[in-house]
Amino acid sequence: MFTWLREKISNYIIRYLHKPVWKYESFSVTSPEILETYLEPGDVLLVEGNQRVSSIIKFLTQSTWSHATLYIGDRASHHDGAPLNLIEAEADGGVKAVPLSKYKYYNTRICRPTGLDKGEITQLIDYAISRIGHQYDMKNIIDLGRYLFPYPPVPIFVRRRMLALGSGDPTRAICSTLIAQAFQSINYPILPEITKESIETCQHKYVEREIYHIRHHSLFTPRDFDLSPYFSVVKPTIEKGFNHKAIRWEHQKSSPEKNGAA
């Protein structure tokens, strides 16, 4: 009885949270064709969503980004041959592969891990692909249901703790935790906790060394890949050769007087 009621409430919240907001500004949309040119397997593609749930996540994380996907290249394809380049976790389908074109009208950002060899990238993508078909963590939906109001009264110092969403069940996932687990499977850092300890050398001197601690995957949010010092931000406009001198500004248009017109 309780399970049935919980599922009914979850489905209602899903429908509510996934309705688009009335205003979405596309400041920096990159076409799928250009994105695909500069994306590399293993890249994280962040998305600024246009749904109610996106607004909640952006508010709680104080970030532009509300969704995270993993670019897998040509490792998966639809039955009709259409490429499925991204792996993501969403409430309306669990973990699945989707085409890059799904986000052609959205603001996006490419975050790239550094120094991975081909074997590690393969292992990373294999991990994500092996999760396809896993259910979305519905406890996350219940958690987000607490923040249906546009601006919940959440103190800044507790926002991170409140975003420890989900049940922790390894067979269920949300977008950022799925990708965090994939990178943790190859021991690649995102935002680890770092402590220092003193060790004595053979010369009886003490030196400090840093110890990295893996944070629980449920604590990760999309913005962490943007903030991480271990991921570089790739901007296609810059990569393809940006020249600011080629821009024609409105205020620089030639006036009729300058052209000798009467």
Regions found by a protein language model. Name each.
Residues 1-262:
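Cysteine-nucleophile amide-bond enzymes
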